[in-house]
Amino acid sequence: MLVNVNVVEAAANADVDRYFLASSVCVYRDMELGEAELTEDDAYPALPDNEYGWEKLYAERAVASYAREGRFQARIARFQNCYGPQGTWTGGREKAPAALCRKVAESTDGTIEVWGDGSAVRSFIYVDDLVEGVRRLVDSDVSDPTNIGTREYVSVRELVDLVSSSAEKEITPLWVPGPVGVQNRNFSNDRIESLGFEPTFDLVQ
C-alpha cells in the first residue's frame, strides 16, 4: 500500500496532468452463480474477498483523493483476468488459461489435476484488448473507476474442455482440493463499452 501512496504523491508533486491506476475486479465481494452483473458502484459497501482486493481499493481511494484536490486527473481501470503472450505460465501465480494450457501440453497419461470442482466461473481478456480498453479510458473524460473485461464467461470445467479440444487431446480432469478463489466473477462493462470499446479476441482464438 505504501508503494501506491508514495507513487501517487510523487506524481502529484511532479505536476503530472493525468494519473492512471491499474486496479482490479478483486475489489468486489464474492458472488454467487446466477447473480446479476456488478457495476462499478457495487464496490461499496466494501467487502473484497482477499487482501489484494483491499490493497487495490485503498489505492483507488488514494488516487481519488489527490484528484479531488485538483492535483491531477485520475483514470482508474479495474482489470478482469488478463492472458496472452509473455504471461506467467509456471510457479503458481499463472492465470487459469496459462496453467491449463501447460498442464494439458505436459500430460502424458490423459489426465490433469485441477483445483476445485470445475464450477467456478471466470472471464478472461486478451492483453491486446485490455491495452485498447486502457487507451480508450485514458483518452476519455471518465474519471470514475471503470471495469475492463469481456462478456465471455466460462467455468473452469468448460475451460479445460476448450483447451483440450484446441490441443486435440483427450483429457480427463482430476478435481483435487485447493484454493479456487471466489465462486463467480460477473461484472458490467457498460461504462467502458460506452467509450466504443469492444473486445476482438475470444478464448478460442
Each language-model region and where it sits:
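Structural element of the ATP-grasp superfamily
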Residues: 7, 63, 100, 192-193
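Active-site pre-Tyr helix/loop in NAD(P)-dependent dehydrogenases
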Residues: 24-25, 41-44, 51, 79-86, ...
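Hydrophobic positions on the long internal alpha-helix
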Residues: 3, 7-11, 62-63, 133, ...
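NAD(P)-dependent short-chain dehydrogenase/reductase
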Residues: 31-37, 64-138, 161-165
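Conserved Rossmann-fold NAD(P)-dependent oxidoreductase catalytic core, especially the SDR/UDP-sugar
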Residues: 5-51, 75
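Conserved cofactor-binding/catalytic machinery of classical short-chain dehydrogenase/reductase
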Residues: 2-6, 18, 44, 58-59, ...
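C-terminal substrate-binding subdomain of Rossmann-fold SDR/epimerase-dehydratase oxidoreductases
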Residues: 106-205
